[in-house]
Amino acid sequence: MRIQIDAFDRKFNEIHERYLLLLSMTDKADLYKRPRELPMSFAMFSVGEYLLRSAAAIEQTFGGITTRLWDDPFEWTLPEKLTTTELVIDYVNESDSTRRRGMAFLDDDSALLKQIPAPSEIKPIFELLLDTVSRAEHFQGRAFAVFQMLSDEKLPRI
């Protein structure tokens, strides 16, 4: 059975669709625009930076599942490299392709119990995927919050 795997797959698809939606709503000039910094608050990043962090979390996890290489995609996801909305969309799609290849490795729900060496410790794949969904949605939520700070547009229902 693939009940849990299919649930994860749907969740990752939803995240991917929201990337594309937010990128289509974000003005090119606002992609890497940061809200003004306030004293005594956490550092804020741009819509583009948060979306890249979100997609990079997914790419790193599925790269680890498929190749056991837990490289942080930080170097090739810098705003200096991905300067346009189109390049960010290309990266988001590339991250999704990596995820699809990784999901194809999982034959049935019992595969989620398999323990693999993650970046800092051995974990079941289920736990890795749950953590990845959480991190990806967290960064994506921040991207939507920054979008709302910079724009007068109403956020879509998600």
Language model: regions and residue ranges:
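Hydrophobic alpha-helical segments and helix-packing faces
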Residues: 12-15, 40-47, 81, 85, ...
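Acidic/histidine-rich alpha-helical segments that form the ligand environment
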Residues: 80-116, 124-142
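C-terminal ligand-sensing/allosteric alpha-helical core of TetR-family HTH transcriptional regulators
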Residues: 15, 53-57, 61, 91-98, ...
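Short, contiguous alpha-helical
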Residues: 9, 20, 31-76, 117-158
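Short acidic-aromatic linear motifs embedded in glycine-rich loops, typified by GG[WY][YF]DAGD(H)
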Residues: 4, 72-84
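Amphipathic alpha-helical packing segments from all-alpha helical-bundle domains
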Residues: 19-22, 95
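Surface-exposed helix-capping loop/turn segments at secondary-structure junctions
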Residues: 25-32, 102-113, 148-155
